[in-house]
Amino acid sequence: MNTIVLFLTLLILVSSCTSIVMKSSNSKERTYPVTPALNPLTGQHSLRQRQLIFCDECANACFRRKKPVRSCQRFICRCAIRDVGY
């Protein structure tokens, strides 16, 4: 009986801390990593072509999360905080 009460108390504390962390992380800007698909021809692409491929994959990653692209510069992908909505 005592173990059950202790377990439930611990569960409530962990869930409340998790909700607080999630709420604070939603207010900050999120940066999503984009991993390009492995391609043996990547070495043959110019820097500009690789950047275009990266930004295309960045846009796809943002749209999968229903977020517009905020920026794609120097191989850093940033999605906007707001959702895409009509």
From Swiss-Prot:
CC per GO annotation: extracellular region
GO BP, sorted A to Z: defense response to fungus; killing of cells of another organism
Regions annotated as coiled coil: none
Keyword terms, alphabetized: Antimicrobial, Disulfide bond, Fungicide, Plant defense, Secreted, Signal
Subcellular location(s) of the protein: Secreted
Signal sequence coordinates: 1-19
Cysteine-cysteine disulfides: C55-C72, C58-C77, C62-C79
Family: Belongs to the DEFL family.
Protein name as annotated: Putative defensin-like protein 211
Lineage of producing organism: Eukaryota, Viridiplantae, Streptophyta, Embryophyta, Tracheophyta
